[in-house]
């Protein structure tokens, strides 16, 4: 949807908004309906051997996270190795894992605006993703207190290690499935028409991100954050000539 709130001789303001609602659900994984089919584990992660953190399961979204339900202490911190016995059999096994959120957003929103005043033009574009979750594999593979001090050396670890207080890895805990909704200011451009045939502009890209996600960047394609190279912030000075 595009609207022009102001349009005068020397001043024009245009606004554009688009909204997409996303929903997906797996309806069948076998040749014929089989309610007993457990699904297909996927989403390999770093740490351990053969660990998968996602599942394709009928009735659930694609690549849903498949994890243990973490139990927390009175101080709000997760208790190491303590999970909810969801099937009430008196022991914690893989049968106690459950489907917990998904990497795809519920809603994607795009917003752009452009203001022109005489020879000046200012434009900006923002994006928002709501309802998407990310498994923070960086944290799950580096937060262990037992690995912070080895061979008389202090090892590099993520700053969130003291919050979990885990001595050993808890790869399949839902503690590491984190809300990755975000708002990003993608681009701002300021342009000036020196003459009808000369235009100069300054552009800034990837300006800021607002999110509660604890990793580097919440925009992770497959929902598993594992050493993704962060996007750069760019500043561009340009000029265009029409002959």
Predicted regions and their residues:
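Conserved small-residue
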Residues: 4-103, 212
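Repeated loop/turn-to-beta-strand initiation elements of outer-membrane beta-barrel proteins
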Residues: 9, 119-123, 198
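Residues that define the transmembrane beta-barrel architecture of outer-membrane proteins
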Residues: 11, 105-109, 177, 181-186, ...
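Membrane-embedded beta-strand positions of outer-membrane beta-barrel proteins
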Residues: 15-17, 124, 200-202, 239
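Outer-membrane beta-barrel and related beta-rich outer-membrane complex signature
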Residues: 24-43, 131-156, 210-219
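C-terminal beta-signal and terminal closure region of outer-membrane beta-barrel proteins
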Residues: 40-66, 72-75, 153-155, 159, ...
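Extracytoplasmic gating/loop element in the C-terminal half of outer-membrane beta-barrel translocons
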Residues: 77, 127-205
